[in-house]
Design a protein with these regions (language model features):
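Acidic-basic catalytic patches of nuclease active cores, encompassing PD-(D/E)XK
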Residues: 2-71
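Intrinsically disordered, low-complexity terminal regions enriched in charged/polar residues
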Residues: 138-160
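Catalytic centers of nucleases
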Residues: 66-94, 98
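Catalytic cores of nucleic-acid endonucleases
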Residues: 1, 87-88, 93-145
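Generic detector of bulky aromatic hydrophobic side chains
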Residues: 32-36, 80, 90, 117
Length: 160
């Protein structure tokens, strides 16, 4: 008998153990573009984790809805499942670092809608842009681990 792996996010490990994740600590990068390594740049998983938190804290918390599940895997769909007025919703979260704005292709939209239809769920996509609070890093589109950020929820749209 094989068991499915239980996945736990870095953030959850950080919150529930004494092992503190250095990538989740606030860092003082100073002003301007500092010396940094490739490992200091946020990876796709960290950007999505940030985006899911933004949607949960700044969008869904203001809706009268019930959170059913969240999935912070970059290849996964949906990232967030919630219920509102007895209707099931499945949401995909896209995050980009300015000046790039995240987009969703027609093929992706068709796949998400098809999947949602199997569950009689509404399909929702959320587009979020983040940028460093430092002007030079913002202009460079640089997302460093532990930096301060500004965010914008570009859109949350229902596809079906």
């Amino acid at each position: 008998m094989t068991k499915e792996p239980y996945l736990i996010s870095r953030k959850a490990i950080h919150q529930h153990t004494n092992r503190k994740d250095s990538r989740l600590q606030i860092r003082d990068w100073g002003v301007g573009i500092p010396d940094f390594n490739k490992e200091d740049i946020m990876v796709e998983e960290e950007l999505l984790d940030f985006g899911v938190d933004i949607i949960l804290d700044h969008y869904l918390s203001k809706q009268e809805c019930k959170l059913i599940e969240e999935n912070r895997g970059v290849a996964g769909f949906p990232n967030i499942v919630y219920q509102k007025n007895n209707q099931l919703y499945m949401m995909k979260v896209f995050v980009g670092v300015l000046p790039n704005r995240p987009t969703c292709t027609k093929e992706q939209k068709d796949f998400y809608i098809s999947h949602c239809n199997k569950f009689n769920a509404k399909c929702v996509i959320a587009s979020i842009s983040i940028c460093s609070s430092d002007e030079e890093r913002k202009k460079a589109g640089l997302a460093l681990v532990g930096d301060g950020y500004n965010m914008c929820i570009n859109e949350v749209i229902e596809l079906n």
